[in-house]
């Protein structure tokens, strides 16, 4: 079944592309969702008139995603977690935790848009990607800190450990 895409569809094509899809996918998903229309001669003429309007809408969505990406990049996000021995986390930091921390920073993001390569199971700083649009990705500078400790206390601990290590080496 040939269809004309009325929106960018991931792993299929961009707005205005004429693509061949399986009949069930076209009839049961793309057409009812308004993401495509059957590629007939009359629909092609109608689509050409509609194209500018759809492109303007897509550009507006992309611009909104870009401004949101700038907001995310500027946000200071840290998550306080419980830790055990050797600063190992109880459990892990999930996209839901990151979405909640972003919400506290004033940026609402759906947790499914947060892309983690692997679960976060240690304290430290991480760069986490967020896909806001097919063309727009943001990077969050995420700090995972121990619950109840401040950054100054961590800095004092590491400063106290350094001379002890040097003395032991002598």
From Swiss-Prot:
Keywords from the named record: Ribonucleoprotein, Ribosomal protein, RNA-binding, rRNA-binding
Disordered as annotated region, ranges: 149-170
PROSITE patterns, sorted: RIBOSOMAL_L9 (PS00651)
UniProt biased composition (Acidic residues): 153-170
UniProt keyword ATP-binding, yes or no: no
Signal peptide: none
InterPro entries registered for this protein in UniProt: Ribosomal_bL9, Ribosomal_bL9/RNase_H1_N, Ribosomal_bL9_bac/chp, Ribosomal_bL9_C, Ribosomal_bL9_C_sf, Ribosomal_bL9_N, Ribosomal_bL9_N_sf
One GO cellular component term noted in the UniProt record for this chain: ribosome
Single GO MF annotation: rRNA binding
GO biological process, one term: translation
Entry annotated with the keyword Repeat: no
Primary role: Binds to the 23S rRNA.
Family (UniProt): Belongs to the bacterial ribosomal protein bL9 family.
PANTHER family: 50S RIBOSOMAL PROTEIN L9 (PTHR21368)
Name used for this protein in its record: Large ribosomal subunit protein bL9
Gene this chain is encoded by: rplI
